[in-house]
């Protein structure tokens, strides 16, 4: 497989099954534009999408209940979907399957750290030189629940860092713990968060990251955190 030229420079949403996938619905309802939407596994049964990433073999869903609640949804998708569904093995029971270009991706990106399906999707975006990647429903951990976490967060954040290093714009759903996005602004920089006047990170007018003491921009932060209320007259 060769890189898909039409993806170069485009804006792509990757939507997983974590809690912050609701932010995707909110973004769509507010007119946020995506050139393509890539669904992770059974999310494809719920939202419109252009591509599915399912790195498990289809037999996991057809021949076992190992996927739990995803099993029936994935069976339905696999039986009827035209594709592309990127996976590790073709199966005659699912006509939409396409082999993931793992040889090309590993060779061209010189990296084999791929321990979950989302990481494969991000690597595919990097390989295809996507311009902007927006992450929804990719959370792994949840604030307030110290006893639950899914494996794979480190791998996903590693690939997002590689994307940023290559010049790709990366955005994460506001409610997601990925890249510490949902952490309060004054808690993002470890150590400084313990100070009476903590350091905070903001974007300047050129959209570059700047670091200030909270006291320097207190009013601006508070104003941005206030909800915007609209009445029936849009005022």
Give the ranges of each region predicted by the language model.
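Metal-ion/cofactor- or nucleotide/acyl-coenzyme-handling active-site neighborhoods
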Residues: 1-235
